[in-house]
Structures are given as structure tokens and as C-alpha cells.
From Swiss-Prot:
GO cellular component terms, semicolon-separated: nucleus
Pfam families, A to Z: WD40
Source organism of this protein record: Pyricularia oryzae (strain 70-15 / ATCC MYA-4617 / FGSC 8958)
Bias-annotated ranges (Low complexity): 313-332
Functional note: Component of the ASTRA complex involved in chromatin remodeling.
Name the UniProt record assigns to this protein: ASTRA-associated protein 1
Subcellular localization, as worded in the UniProt entry: Nucleus
PANTHER family documented for this protein: GUANINE NUCLEOTIDE-BINDING PROTEIN SUBUNIT BETA-LIKE PROTEIN 1 (PTHR19854:SF1), TRANSDUCIN BETA-LIKE 3 (PTHR19854)
Signal peptide boundaries: none
Protein's UniProt keywords contain Repeat: yes
Bias-annotated ranges (Polar residues): 280-290, 333-352
Biased composition (Pro residues): 301-312
Keyword annotations of the record: Chromatin regulator, Nucleus, Repeat, WD repeat
């Protein structure tokens, strides 16, 4: 008889807390103020600010007259909300301001006049398509009174185009028009790569693309080139998120696919790398390029194209991939012919179209995709009521969080790495802990800031709060 103990099956995960308070389905969630607060928004336009040290509401108000599409923090004292009432609002919400705001939750039948925080800016924008905003901060100091930011939203008149607004001026800086055949913009992210403004977009027809400024600039005005386009999804894109390193982005859709896409570096970065490697500029992603690189011009037209050598375990570089495609597509053409790049689209040889990885999860309808700040995992909210956690590296499913009985619409991760401004606070907390002077309140605050939170909002109006990995 064997004396070895049988393995104990893993226990299913349980939420750390359930936040009950919304009467309508929860559509948006975001951690703000160094993870001390969780902000959630529902289909009635209500916003609830939860204090994670006590798991209680600290501020409740109706921010919009229609469905709330998105929520985001801007520094530690400002909150941005976006509703289907065609308004995007920037609120001033400091910790001291919470004392003057209502605590009565939307689910409470008691009628109460809920005051609103101070309204700083309001943009009249389009909400024809359920796509929320993207914030690109421009100021190095997120707490400066003179801070600047850009807001990207779908265009007011043309739902496939993208408007970029400037704050605090509230002026429309630029409109990006990337084509007329993709349908409505469903999800977008605006960010910068090596000083170049870049946008990742998911469309109604399942297309995901990356467009980038042709020239480095401090404003988004100018020519934008499509650098990557893929139609790997068969249904509308529901959500996307960009990695902190700006080297890839992930998309989810109404189909069952999760897709990892590349973010090409700026064309000038590719040129610089080519020169450092001894490659001629004609073979790189230049604005005016040879249809066939000089290095390949001496090859007979019918000779096979040899793929550039790849380092084991390392994907082919963007430059090598572009050269291989260029040689294969133009082998029969004259090596001396030159092609001028159009003003709105790049040469075909520079347009990437292959995703990094495509995974069929067998679970249709995953939305609210978010990548955690450490870049290790991402999560989705499922129409089947499940919250799924995946590895960013392998795209493998790591966990399925089951608690809600109806569909989930939103997920949010707390920030793992504390901002530089909180390092001194952490040092003081550590010193106090060693001295035995930590109060219960300080312990709660410390835990709220350091916990690896995952919040999920559901159709039932409840928010589940999980502590994972």
C-alpha cells in the first residue's frame, strides 16, 4: 500500500471583496490615486469612488445622463469620464473634495441631491459607437497646474476617423483619416513611440491597425502613415490595450480570438538601425525607397529568396522581414526604379500585416481587455460571466475567475510599480513597521497601495475585487 499522499486539488479563487452599489450594469472601472481608490461607472451615468482601505464609497454622483463608456485618472487630483450623452468631462477630485460629496449609492432608493465635483473641462464629442477615449499625457509633471494632455476619440461626423483634442485649450488639434472601408472605430489608444505620435485602432470589420506620424513633432498635426494592418478578427473588435514598452498591443473581439499585434518602430529608427548595421538606406523603410535593394539586385530573377538568418528563440526583426517581403514581391522589377511614398499611406513593403500570435480561446465575446502595468498578464471580461487572466508572453490562459452569474463588461488592474513620488512614503511606512508604530489605518493604506488588485464590473451592477499573482 502506497504511503504517498494524494495531491490536494487547487482551491478555486474567491474575490477579496464584493462592492455592491450600482443599480445598472457596470461599464467602466479604473484604479486611481496610487491604488487607494477604485472608480466605477454604470449604464445610468453614475460614478462611484470606492475607498479600498475600508471598501466603502467616498464619493457618488451622476456624471452623465446616459451610459458611461470610460473612466480614467489624470494625475492624482483629476478624473476623466466619458458618456454616451456626447460629453467628455474632466473633474477635479482631490481627497479633500470627497468630504463635500454624497456617499449614498445609486442602488439606495432614498432620493438625495448628489453634488458634483468641480468641473474643469468639458468636450462635446461623438458617441455614436461605444468607443471610449484615450488619454496621452504631455507634461512630465502629472501634478502641475499647467499640465497638458491629448484626448483621442472617434470623429464627430465620420465614425471611422479619429479626432485628437488638446487639454486644457479644449481645441481639436487634428483629425486622422485612415480609410473609409473599415467601419466604425470600436477601440483606440493614442501614445508616443520615440517621440512619434502613434495610434492603435480596432474597427467594426475586425481590422486592427497602427498609424504613426511621418515626422517627429510636439503636436499630432501632420501626415500619418499606416504601418501595420491586419484583419485577423472575424467580428468587431471590442477592446484593445497597449503594452507599457510600446512594442505590442492586444485585441479582443466578439469572436473567440485574442490577438497579439506588433507596433512597428518609427521609420527613422529603422533607418538608423540599418545604417549602424551597414545596410543601405534604400533597403530600409525610407520615404523614397528602391523597389529592390542593391544587395539583391545581382540575384537572378528566378533565384529563390533566402530568408535572413534568425537568432534561435528570437523573432525576425522588422527590418529583415521588410527586406524579405520586398525582395519576394519585386524580384521581377528593375532594381533602379524608384517609388515615391504617397502622402497618406506608406509603400506596400513597409506595411506589416502579420500578427505576432493568434489564440482561439473558444470563448466568444471577451471585452474590456487590460494589460497589467508590469506587462506579465492581461485580463478580459467575458459575456459568459467569467473573468479570464492570460500570460502576455505565451497568451496561455492562467486563471478563470468565477463569481458573477451574468456577463462581465469591464476589468481594471491596479498599478504594480509605485510612482517615484510614493517611494519616500513607502520608506517611511517600512521604518514605522520596524518600529512597531503602524496603526490599523496605515496597514490598510499600505495594503491597498501594494495589493495586486483586479476589479471586474458586471451586468448585475456588482464589482468583484480579486487579489492575484
Amino acid at each position: 500500500m502506497s504511503t504517498s499522499a494524494a495531491p490536494v486539488p487547487a482551491q478555486p479563487a474567491h474575490p477579496r471583496s464584493i462592492l455592491r452599489g450600482h443599480k445598472a450594469q457596470v461599464h467602466a472601472a479604473a484604479f486611481v490615486r496610487n491604488n487607494e481608490r477604485l472608480v466605477t461607472g454604470d449604464a445610468d451615468g453614475f460614478v462611484v469612488v470606492w475607498d479600498l482601505t475600508i471598501m466603502r464609497p467616498r464619493a457618488v454622483w451622476r456624471a452623465h445622463d446616459d451610459v458611461l463608456l470610460g473612466i480614467g485618472g489624470w494625475g492624482t487630483d483629476r478624473l476623466i469620464t466619458h458618456g454616451r450623452d456626447n460629453k467628455l468631462i474632466v473633474w477635479q477630485l482631490r481627497e479633500a473634495d470627497e468630504d463635500s460629496l454624497a456617499k449614498t449609492l445609486p442602488v439606495d432608493p432614498a432620493a438625495e441631491d448628489r453634488p458634483k465635483p468641480w468641473l474643469l473641462y468639458m468636450l462635446e464629442i461623438s458617441t455614436m459607437n461605444f468607443c471610449t477615449f484615450s488619454l496621452c499625457e504631455m507634461s512630465s509633471d502629472p501634478l502641475s497646474e499647467d499640465r497638458e494632455a491629448l484626448i483621442a476619440v472617434p470623429n464627430t461626423l465620420s465614425s471611422e476617423a479619429i479626432d485628437i483634442f488638446h487639454l486644457p485649450s479644449q481645441k481639436r488639434e487634428h483629425t486622422i483619416r485612415l480609410g473609409q472601408s473599415e467601419g466604425m472605430v470600436m477601440a483606440l489608444e493614442l501614445f508616443r513611440v520615440d517621440g512619434y505620435f502613434t495610434v492603435a485602432v480596432g474597427y467594426e470589420n475586425g481590422v486592427a491597425l497602427v498609424a504613426q506620424q511621418a515626422e517627429r513633432s510636439e503636436t499630432p498635426v501632420g501626415t500619418w502613415n499606416v504601418r501595420y494592418r491586419s484583419k485577423a478578427h472575424t467580428q468587431p473588435v471590442l477592446s484593445l490595450d497597449v503594452s507599457l514598452g510600446r512594442d505590442f498591443f492586444l485585441t479582443s473581439s466578439a469572436d473567440s480570438l485574442l490577438i497579439k499585434h506588433p507596433i512597428p518602430p518609427p521609420q527613422t529608427s529603422v533607418l538608423k538601425t540599418a545604417r549602424e548595421d551597414g545596410t543601405t538606406s534604400e533597403g530600409a523603410n525610407a520615404s523614397v525607397i528602391d523597389s529592390q535593394p542593391p544587395a539583391l539586385a545581382s540575384r537572378p530573377p528566378d533565384a529563390p529568396v533566402a530568408a535572413p538568418p534568425a537568432t534561435p528563440g528570437k523573432p525576425m526583426s522588422l527590418l529583415s522581414a521588410a527586406l524579405a517581403r520586398e525582395a519576394a514581391g519585386d524580384s521581377a522589377e528593375s532594381p533602379t526604379r524608384r517609388t515615391t511614398q504617397p502622402s497618406d499611406t506608406p509603400p506596400e513593403s513597409t506595411l506589416l500585416s502579420e500578427p505576432v500570435k493568434v489564440v482561439n480561446t473558444k470563448h466568444a465575446g471577451q471585452q474590456g481587455l487590460r494589460i497589467r502595468s508590469d506587462g506579465r498578464i492581461f485580463a478580459t471580461a467575458g459575456w459568459d460571466s467569467r473573468v479570464r487572466v492570460y500570460s502576455c508572453k505565451t497568451m496561455k490562459e492562467l486563471a478563470v475567475l468565477k463569481w458573477h452569474q451574468v456577463g462581465c463588461f469591464a476589468v481594471a488592474f491596479s498599478t504594480i510599480d509605485a510612482p517615484a513620488g510614493t517611494q519616500a512614503e513607502g520608506a517611511r511606512d517600512g521604518l514605522a513597521a520596524r518600529m512597531g508604530d503602524v496603526t490599523v489605518k496605515e496597514k490598510r493604506i499600505s495594503h491597498a497601495k501594494s495589493a495586486h488588485w483586479l476589479a471586474a464590473g458586471s451586468k448585475d451592477g456588482k464589482v468583484s475585487l480579486w487579489e492575484i499573482y
